[in-house]
Amino acid sequence: MPAGDSHTTGCYYNVSAPSAATKKYLALYAEAEAHYVVSCIPNAVHYDSCLCIPAFDENAELLTRLALFAKSHLKCLFILVINQPARITAASKANLALVATIEKKLVKQQSHHNLNLYALNDANDLLVVDRYTQGNQIPSLQGVGQARKIAADIALR
């Protein structure tokens, strides 16, 4: 999948049941969103894989690229962590436009805390993590690494 700019990179995971070590890690070190996702995605839903995407100042065209990529993947959870450093007080216009496009084009299935689950197509879902609005922003020195960790922790669930 072509990257929109240098702020977006993806990590692709095959999903399986968490091991005892993974469960211990999640209990001790996981980000809050990894615990919230249990209330956002129904237990009956199973994904074969997931794609973790941190996004800051991405063009709304990202949704189109994700939808095209999703056509070749079945039962995939796309985890989009829309983030912004805390030193920037107002939400980025690009982040707001991306979220507005998602809300306009996709059907929201579930919502819990700063997580919103959307149907991307018949076989795949998009989980949007809000780490860009006031109070949810990522500490400035942690940046994209923190966004990746949030997505990876969710993927491990």
Where is each model-derived feature located?
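Short beta-strand/loop segment that forms part of the nucleotide-sugar
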Residues: K75-A86, L126-T133
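Short acidic, gly/pro-rich beta-turn/loop elements at beta-sheet edges
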Residues: E61-L63, I88-A90, I138
